[in-house]
């Protein structure tokens, strides 16, 4: 069984304190500029993913990039653990859900780091697609 809301921190006091500190950063740091920069690099990665024959449904919303490895599969696909190990072997924390690979980078990510993630997603498509 999958715990579908594993990333929810609803009303957790520590998470609320972190959220407050995060809002303070928006006042003191160029956060929107960082978001725009990450989104632009992700757009370049999207074009690369869309061109790969073993990936389907490549898409981007803001800084989030996702694609399905292979042409068939679903959220409950057993490919997820294999993909997780594949990315971990490359020192990348990329969380697949079934055969869908999501890339949700922190806003401090560099071009080189994002490109390494895109490269790994393409390698995974070659290996598992």
Residue ranges and their predicted role:
Residues 1-129:
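Conserved N-terminal phosphate-binding loop of PLP-dependent enzymes in the Aspartate aminotransferase
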């Amino acid at each position: 069984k999958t715990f579908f809301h594993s990333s929810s921190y609803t009303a957790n006091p520590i998470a609320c304190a972190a959220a407050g500190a995060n809002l303070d950063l928006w006042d003191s740091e160029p956060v929107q500029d960082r978001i725009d920069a990450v989104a632009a690099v992700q757009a370049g990665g999207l074009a690369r993913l869309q061109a790969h024959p073993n990936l389907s449904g490549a898409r981007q919303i803001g800084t989030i990039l996702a694609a399905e490895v292979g042409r068939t599969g679903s959220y409950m696909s057993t490919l997820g653990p294999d993909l997780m190990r594949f990315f971990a072997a490359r020192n990348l924390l990329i969380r697949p859900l079934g055969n869908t690979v999501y890339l949700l980078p922190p806003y401090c990510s560099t071009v080189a780091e994002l490109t390494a993630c895109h490269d790994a997603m393409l390698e995974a498509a070659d290996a598992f697609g």
